[in-house]
Amino acid sequence: MRLFNLCIILVTFFSCAMDKSSKDFFDNCTESSVDLSNGIRVKDSLGYFSFMMPDSSWMPKRYVGENTTGLTIGDVSSDGHLFVFNASHAYYTGEWDWEKEQANVEKDFNVVETGKVHLLGQSRPLNIVHFQVDSPQTISYYISIIDTLNRSNYTLNLTTNYGEDYESRICEMKPLLESFTIHL
């Protein structure tokens, strides 16, 4: 009887202790038609990171700024939907403060949802931003990766046009995120 009571207590404890808010957005994604098996690995101009693109039709665009480097790829599907993946690297100074950064993002952008994504072996913050003034309107999934040792901030975003079924289009691009690699 004691063992039975102990089991009930443990089951109750673990079910209450589970963080239901940390559900990964991509848990609901099914298969993707973005095939990277014959893809092309592309790197940013300074060699901080790389990722796979499906083929040359995704037209990579690189940029280098004073403190940043970035790489964007994109394509338009046969039914007219926009698919864009961007990764950027920047150095930061001072101590990184997630709460302060999140408050700034929410102040500066139309954040419609926040969450977590499991990427590169860790849970990462996710901000879903609706750009209403764009034409067409777009929605972007921003994921932050902070390297406190090298004081580096990597921002990844998946963007598609806003409208019905945008979540499935974001899910289609999941393999692009998974192919992201940091080069130290």
Predicted regions, residues:
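Sec-dependent bacterial lipoprotein signal peptides
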Residues: 1-14
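N-terminal targeting sequences that direct proteins away from the cytosol to non-cytosolic compartments
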Residues: 16-72, 111, 120-123, 148-152, ...
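A short acidic-to-branched-hydrophobic micro-motif
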Residues: 68-99
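Solvent-exposed loop/turn segments at secondary-structure junctions
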Residues: 90-92, 133-136, 162-164
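Surface-exposed aromatic
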Residues: 81-85, 127, 155
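Short amphipathic alpha-helical segments
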Residues: 96-97, 101, 168-172
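Signature of long, low-cysteine stretches enriched in small and polar/charged residues
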Residues: 99-151
